Amino acid sequence: MRDTGVKSLSRDDVLKYSQTVCDGLRDDDDGVRREVLAHAGNRWSLGVIHTLGVYGQLRHAEIGRRMHGVTQRMLTRTLRHLERDGLVVRHDFEEVIPHVEYALSETGLELLVRMVPLWTWIVENVDSFRAARTTFDRKHRNGKP
């Protein structure tokens, strides 16, 4: 196993811990854990969480401008899921021109903090991913294994 910086855990310890977490997901009677994992772990949700973490409280359109490729419909759905799961807070401003802004909740901020090591790991290992893809593509050229 490659050195991950977690010297106190053996491979078996990591596997046992991973199994415990997976068992917790499996034992989720009402499906909330799995649903939150699916919502919070998808491309657009992570983008919203990152955007609100970096820029703070924003309007819907401002979030959309900072997230390349997201449609208005997908952004609306994503914000609703994140709000329902308690990761994002919606602020309604009843002014002369009413508007809505979104911000990370404390739980959303905690998710952002926990995602940074994964994003860092991905950035640090991008050359390994590229090399693996090149090797795989070379071996499987023209659909042949």
Give a label for each model feature.
Residues 4-20, 27, 106-109, 113-145:
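Amphipathic alpha-helical dimerization/coiled-coil segments
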Residues 22-74, 101:
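N-terminal helix-turn-helix DNA-binding core of bacterial DNA-binding proteins
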Residues 47, 51, 87, 107, ...:
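Solvent-exposed, amphipathic alpha-helical segments
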Residues 65, 77, 117-120:
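Generic recognition of well-ordered alpha-helical segments
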Residues 75, 79-85:
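Basic amphipathic alpha-helical segments that dock to polyanions
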Residues 83-103:
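Beta-hairpin "wing" of winged helix-turn-helix
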